[in-house]
From Swiss-Prot:
Pfam families: Ribosomal_S15. It comes from Marinobacter nauticus (strain ATCC 700491 / DSM 11845 / VT8) (Marinobacter aquaeolei). Part of the 30S ribosomal subunit. Forms a bridge to the 50S subunit in the 70S ribosome, contacting the 23S rRNA. Disulfide bonds: none annotated. This is Small ribosomal subunit protein uS15.
């Protein structure tokens, strides 16, 4: 269910702002989005998995907070990120 190390490395490489950047909001949101998408596929097959659903809701809330922070600090980077990830708003 979790992302493999190679998938994480590819996402970090695609969204990092500089070499070795793993903590920028863009990278964090991209990783959360990938995890959320994987969990959504999991729930199509496992509708009764309420324990994991709680984790999904937590990830969605964390992503929302990071997106709100990025929108406050740098609206241009925010708009570029949601366009690249295909998120609404």
């Amino acid at each position: 269910m979790a992302l493999s190390a190679s998938e994480k490395a590819q996402i970090v490489k695609d969204f990092q702002q500089g070499d070795g950047d793993t903590g920028s909001p863009e990278v964090q949101v991209a990783l959360l989005s990938a995890n959320i998408n994987k969990l959504q596929d999991h729930f199509k097959a496992n509708k009764q998995d309420h324990h994991s659903r709680r984790g999904l809701i937590r990830m969605v809330n964390q992503r929302r907070k990071l997106l709100d922070y990025l929108k406050r600090k740098n609206a241009d980077r925010y708009l570029e990120l949601i366009q690249r990830l295909g998120l609404r708003r």
